[in-house]
């Protein structure tokens, strides 16, 4: 038969083993805290640590105060086990298990708090706060917002500066003065009406009292004590009514004088404002006239600059370009003359004689056909002579032939040119000027024509205005 101490140790060891195997299987976070109920009847004949069987797992977010109280209670519960004489190794093992569970709970609690703290800044940054949006705005956007906020004040300040420069600020001061005087006139007229009403009431009171006094005097022989007292009261109040009537009359006169003064001052201010506005409008009109004359002067100056400097330069450039083209054409003609056989002198002379007239007047298609037929006839008539001359002058150099042809050419005289220019030619020229044929014009030429027309129109209108003002 086993002894009692040995049985007690065996039961205690089995209880500790059960608590050790049950602790790792439990989760560090319990779904709900288990209430600790220690009844008095829970003790057995042999002492077993109830804390080892029903261990309380604290929640992750419990306070440190509750933890300290739980640890104190655990110590109190574990004290009887020590008193019963259990070995130290068995007592140290439950304490180690409790420390492990508390450490794991603390680490989980701290990790949860750190994760919560890490989640909070991300949610605030990604939440679109006004400060976050303001920091992401560009500098240009901020400047534009500031400029738009100050736009109304800037416009007001600019208008005020313009009024100061033109002298309209004094007219605005007169306007404000006129508004104040209008208010003063309305108040004066209101006082006049009030004084009239008070004066009329005083007159009515005095007339009523006098009428009653007269009625009492008519039946003086039949006065009663009440009538005597009433007569005495009315006689005493008659002087008061007279003084009140005089005072209201004086107040009415003063109010009427003030109203008349306010009306006169208002009329004077209105007249001065009208005069100042007329002077200001004349000043602005004069300034606009001088501005118009200035613009006209600028237009005339530009016109003179174009006519004196730009137009000669443009003409020189055109002439130079035309001369270059003519020289190129002459060079090409010389090359062709040297490369081809030289025609007879008479034929070249006839062509040179016909060329100026053809250059002056543009022939019609019928004239071209007739000239071609006549040239063919002359060529056919002169073929035997030209062949003979070619055979005779075969030994002559091309340079001598060209020099002789140039010497034989004579330019047409002025009389022949004038005779060729007839009325029909002038009519054709006018018809060409008024025709609807397309013309290529550069933008500069159009600008020059527009500026010239504007300057001419401005000059003409200035002369007309000057003549009208002088008359």
Swiss-Prot record:
Residues 311-447 are mitochondrial intermembrane. It is found in: Mitochondrion inner membrane. It comes from the Eukaryota. The chain crosses the membrane at residues 290-310, 448-468. Homooligomer. This is Sensitive to high expression protein 9 homolog, mitochondrial. Residues 168-269 form a coiled coil. InterPro entries: MDM33_fungi (IPR008839). GO terms for biological process: inner mitochondrial membrane organization. Residues 84-132, 347-408 are annotated as: Disordered. It is a multi-pass membrane protein. The lineage of its organism: Eukaryota, Fungi, Dikarya, Ascomycota, Pezizomycotina. The keyword Transmembrane helix applies. The keyword Mitochondrion applies. GO terms for cellular component: mitochondrial inner membrane. Residues 376-387 have a biased composition (Low complexity). Required for the maintenance of the structure of the mitochondrial inner membrane. Involved in mitochondrial morphology. Causes growth arrest when highly overexpressed.
């Amino acid at each position: 038969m086993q002894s009692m101490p040995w049985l007690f140790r065996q039961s205690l060891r089995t209880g500790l083993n059960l608590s050790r195997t049950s602790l790792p299987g439990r989760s560090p976070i319990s779904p709900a805290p288990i209430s600790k109920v220690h009844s008095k009847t829970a003790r057995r004949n042999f002492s077993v640590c109830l804390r080892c069987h029903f261990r309380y797992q604290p929640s992750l977010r419990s306070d440190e105060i509750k933890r300290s109280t739980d640890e104190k209670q655990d110590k109190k519960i574990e004290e009887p086990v020590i008193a019963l004489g259990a070995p130290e190794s068995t007592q140290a093992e439950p304490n180690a298990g409790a420390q492990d569970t508390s450490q794991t709970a603390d680490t989980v609690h701290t990790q949860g708090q750190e994760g919560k703290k890490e989640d909070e800044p991300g949610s605030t940054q990604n939440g679109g706060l006004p400060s976050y949006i303001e920091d992401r705005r560009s500098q240009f956007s901020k400047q534009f917002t500031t400029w738009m906020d100050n736009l109304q004040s800037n416009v007001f300040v600019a208008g005020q500066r313009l009024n100061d420069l033109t002298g309209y600020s004094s007219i605005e001061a007169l306007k404000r003065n006129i508004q104040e005087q209008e208010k003063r006139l309305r108040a004066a007229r209101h006082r006049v009406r009030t004084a009239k009403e008070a004066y009329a009431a005083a007159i009515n009171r005095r007339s009523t009292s006098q009428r009653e006094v007269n009625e009492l005097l008519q039946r003086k022989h039949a006065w009663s004590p009440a009538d005597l007292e009433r007569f005495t009261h009315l006689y005493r109040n008659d002087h008061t009514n007279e003084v009140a009537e005089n005072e209201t009359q004086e107040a009415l006169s003063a109010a009427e004088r003030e109203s008349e003064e306010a009306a006169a001052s208002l009329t004077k201010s209105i007249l001065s404002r009208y005069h100042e506005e007329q002077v200001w409008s004349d000043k602005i009109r004069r300034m606009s006239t001088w501005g118009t004359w200035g613009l006209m002067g600028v237009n005339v100056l530009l016109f003179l600059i174009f006519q004196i400097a730009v137009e000669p330069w443009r003409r020189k450039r055109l002439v130079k370009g035309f001369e270059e083209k003519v020289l190129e054409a002459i060079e090409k003609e010389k090359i062709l003359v040297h490369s081809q056989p030289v025609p007879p002198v008479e034929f070249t002379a006839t062509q040179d004689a016909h060329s100026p007239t053809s250059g002056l007047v543009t022939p019609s298609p019928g004239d071209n056909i007739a000239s071609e037929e006549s040239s063919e006839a002359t060529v056919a008539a002169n073929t035997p002579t030209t062949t003979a001359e070619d055979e005779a002058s075969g030994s002559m150099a091309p340079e001598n032939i060209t020099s002789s042809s140039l010497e034989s050419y004579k330019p047409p005289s002025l009389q022949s040119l004038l005779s060729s220019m007839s009325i029909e030619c002038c009519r054709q020229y006018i018809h060409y000027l008024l025709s609807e044929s397309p013309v290529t014009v550069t933008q500069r030429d159009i600008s020059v024509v527009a500026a010239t027309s504007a300057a001419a129109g401005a000059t003409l209108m200035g002369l007309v205005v000057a003549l009208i003002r002088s008359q």
